[in-house]
């Protein structure tokens, strides 16, 4: 049965369009540089927020109007698959993502859970045969069920570690079967509340053991997708071990895992870590670790993960700047890990939200491409650091200087003159490029 029968396929109509159910800036076939927008952006729908989210919060019950919610159990799971692929087709989106519990309910036993997953994966596989929409990534939910109260791979209970491993094993088998481009690890419960009852060294060692086992099993079954770590500093756990890119990178390097992983970076997680979105992208990029993106935004006035759809054009521009500088996302994409607000409870709001996010990143892509083509920031940065291309600066970079040589150089200096960083000028240029792209017809 159709679930969005009042919605037609979303088409590109251009900036002058007044149709709320049309793209104003995202034209999948438009070339930006040597790729189309669709190839650059690789958009993805998050199954959990879009098809399982009900709008509930700590202060109120679920209120989302979803036609498929008239069903329950496995019938509900099947209806969600039907609704999902109708949504994908009407939005003309190339990818989707899910956790295992998003697509099928957990059973009374692990075997029953596997059976439920197999039934729904069979159904998804059939739909994918005739759909352009592919699986960007999947993952195992290792944080919702009470068994994970003390963590999964970092749990103090070895039985929980084993159960988590079984779920990831199944997840990797599903990833291979459905042709997932990536597989994600997010450690929402991998951390601690107090050191008074925590063996941090054992927990970190066990987390590394767990990830090495995952790498080994992927090789065993021939899954060649990219493994991704998704950093987040807090929520639900006070001290999460994958606080930010730098922290997680240090962990991967320490335990010999760096060659097997890249990062899935979420904008709102960067906010919670006290960073900008572009900061996290830059840190990952310069270390060759930028793999994929969870595209959303947070509310700067609130201290939790609000998962709003991305509409901040400065943020999308600076994000796309980093992604283009990275040469793209490879097998990754821009997954809308975002939910409509609780007050936006009608089915068509799902389309309005995704259109807003897709248009926002399309603008960001075009502005970022122009900034890079015109070398707006590159030229300024090169001039700013010019002292390292000649004289004593060049010797520092080439490793031929030492403290003796640097002291001798410093002793002959007079008063050192610095130059302005010109932040305001550069922000004005960013505004100019952004406004020019938005004004173009």
Swiss-Prot record:
Keywords: Carbohydrate metabolism, Cytoplasm, Isomerase, Manganese, Metal-binding, Xylose metabolism
Binding-site positions, Mn(2+) 1: 230, 266, 294, 337
Short name of one Pfam family: AP_endonuc_2
Cofactor note: Binds 2 manganese ions per subunit.
SUPFAM superfamilies: Xylose isomerase-like
Source organism superkingdom: Bacteria
EC number: 5.3.1.5
Compartments where found: Cytoplasm
GO MF annotation terms: magnesium ion binding; xylose isomerase activity
Catalytic activity: alpha-D-xylose = alpha-D-xylulofuranose
Binding site residues for Mn(2+) 2: 266, 305, 307
Entry cofactors: Mn(2+)
InterPro entries noted in UniProt: Xyl_isomerase-like_sf, Xyl_isomerase-like_TIM-brl, Xylose_isom_bac, Xylose_isomerase
GO terms of biological process kind: D-xylose metabolic process
Keyword presence, Nucleotide-binding: no
Family: Belongs to the xylose isomerase family.
HAMAP family assigned: Xylose_isom_A (MF_00455)
Protein name per the record: Xylose isomerase
